[in-house]
């Protein structure tokens, strides 16, 4: 197929999000080989071309039609104000965007920032948020190292992404207000050159993302207790049940939410189940 007709997917060229995106694609069977610092790569077995870009450029390039899809942060998508839409949430790279001020600052809400200086890499989001709180500030737009701007005398407050809060503590800062929560997303524009392949990509990625939330639970149970066991682990349509050599017993295989596995195992024991085994799932179709 002519490479000009290939589905183009933009991926972060470096950093933690680059590793996350690359691993996710490979887990979904979208294997590729990128040359050192290469900007392009082909996906094996599919008419898909990967283009490695600056993460914050991906929303704009997708909206403009230079790429059909892209993996980026929902924070960057919102900041760009472009027309690309979220095709699916990938469940990784979660973080919070927050207004942060010095520990000893006499500031108690966003409204108190009226007339103050705020350093941020997200001026558009910050401006909209302040407007909702009847505040207007002088925004200092930066591309990084925002957390030191207060100490340098550049700003009275910052708006930055927060994960654990350890960086804030190290710089004697506290969260004044959280603006929103964000995560890594797959985006797509409305002029996608190959919607059929785009749908296949989405379906493959969904298989990986959904599988993260489930485990396969297998156990043996007396046939007389099968109904009680099925009530504990109902599965999606119904559990897979097989008869064992002893007709009084059967084996059951069922998908269970990972967060509910331990509780389910304990409850299964109370109804007589044995040989209860949890197996992680790397991919699935539901």
For each feature predicted by the language model, list its residue ranges.
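Short, structured active-site "lid" loops
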Residues: 47-66
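Signature of uroporphyrinogen-III synthase
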Residues: 60, 96-100
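Small-molecule-sensing regulatory modules
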Residues: 2-48, 72-85, 89-92, 96, ...
């Amino acid at each position: 197929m002519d490479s000009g007709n290939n589905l183009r997917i933009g991926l972060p060229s470096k950093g933690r999000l680059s590793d996350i995106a690359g691993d996710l694609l490979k887990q979904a069977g979208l294997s590729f080989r990128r040359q050192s610092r290469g900007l392009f790569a082909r996906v094996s077995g599919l008419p898909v071309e990967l283009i490695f870009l600056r993460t914050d450029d991906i929303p704009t390039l997708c909206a403009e039609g230079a790429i059909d899809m892209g993996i980026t942060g929902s924070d960057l998508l919102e900041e760009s104000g472009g027309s690309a839409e979220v095709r699916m949430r990938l469940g990784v790279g979660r973080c919070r965007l927050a207004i942060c001020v010095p520990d000893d600052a006499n500031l108690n809400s966003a409204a108190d920032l009226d007339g103050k200086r705020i350093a941020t890499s997200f001026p558009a989001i910050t401006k909209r948020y302040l407007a909702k709180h009847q505040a207007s500030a002088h925004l200092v737009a930066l591309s990084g190292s925002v957390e030191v701007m207060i100490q340098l005398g550049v700003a009275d407050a910052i708006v930055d992404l927060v994960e654990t809060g350890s960086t804030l503590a190290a710089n004697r800062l506290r969260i004044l207000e959280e603006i929103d929560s964000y995560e890594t997303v797959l985006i797509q524009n409305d002029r996608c050159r190959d919607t059929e392949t785009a749908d296949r990509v989405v379906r493959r990625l969904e298989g990986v993302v959904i599988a993260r939330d489930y485990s396969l639970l297998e156990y043996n149970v007396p046939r007389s207790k099968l109904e009680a066991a099925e009530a504990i682990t109902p599965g999606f349509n119904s559990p897979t049940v097989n008869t064992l050599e002893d007709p009084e017993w059967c084996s059951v295989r069922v998908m269970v939410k990972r967060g509910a596995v331990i509780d389910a195992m304990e409850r299964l024991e109370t109804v007589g189940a044995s040989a209860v085994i949890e197996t992680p799932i790397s991919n699935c179709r539901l």
